[in-house]
């Protein structure tokens, strides 16, 4: 019987990390279904949804410390039950810019209050090329539940912009399902 698990990996970034982890999983007959990886200042973080026969996933759990040691990573494996996709309207992309990191808390508080799920989140901090001020940037992929009006959300975010001196951009995300395929040859 197939089972699913979530594997997280943390360690020093290096060339070949993704291949080494994929090879270790393939050798144990474990499939990678979904994954995210990022490198931050020389450190690497991976989160991987895996699938395999229950015995193979159990074996992976038993060998986790040895695999992690050989890769130079701290590994953690958690069995998961697949949940239904978040129900909601078409996804939105939110970008927010702030002179201080506390602005993001105000944005996420609005999203939480409205029952909006953050599907993907990235933040960055960078210095302005013409001043020494640090600007914080947040990018989030959102799923808005049917109970939340996008117009109401937009109004609330505009009010937050003015009150907290933020810059917030909210736009729909085009899906591949809404775009017709582009022919590559004559008809």
Residue ranges and their predicted role:
Residues 1-187:
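A conserved regulatory-domain signal marking ACT and ACT-like small-molecule sensing domains
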């Amino acid at each position: 019987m197939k089972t699913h698990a979530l594997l997280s990996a943390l360690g020093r970034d290096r060339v070949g990390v993704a291949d080494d982890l994929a090879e270790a999983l393939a050798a144990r007959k474990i499939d990678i279904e979904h994954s995210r990886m990022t490198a931050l200042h020389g450190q690497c973080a991976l989160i991987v949804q895996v699938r395999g026969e229950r015995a193979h996933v159990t074996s992976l759990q038993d060998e986790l410390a040895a695999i992690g040691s050989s890769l130079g990573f701290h590994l953690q494996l958690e069995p998961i039950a697949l949940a239904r996709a978040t129900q909601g309207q078409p996804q939105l992309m939110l970008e927010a810019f702030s002179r201080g990191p506390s602005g993001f808390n105000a944005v996420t508080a609005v999203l939480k209050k409205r029952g909006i799920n953050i599907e993907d989140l990235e933040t960055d901090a960078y210095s302005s090329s013409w001043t020494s001020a640090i600007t914080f940037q947040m990018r989030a992929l959102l799923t808005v539940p049917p109970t939340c009006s996008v117009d109401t959300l937009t109004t609330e975010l505009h009010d937050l912009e003015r009150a907290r001196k933020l810059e917030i951009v909210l736009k729909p995300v085009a899906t591949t399902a809404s775009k017709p395929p582009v022919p590559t040859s004559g008809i």
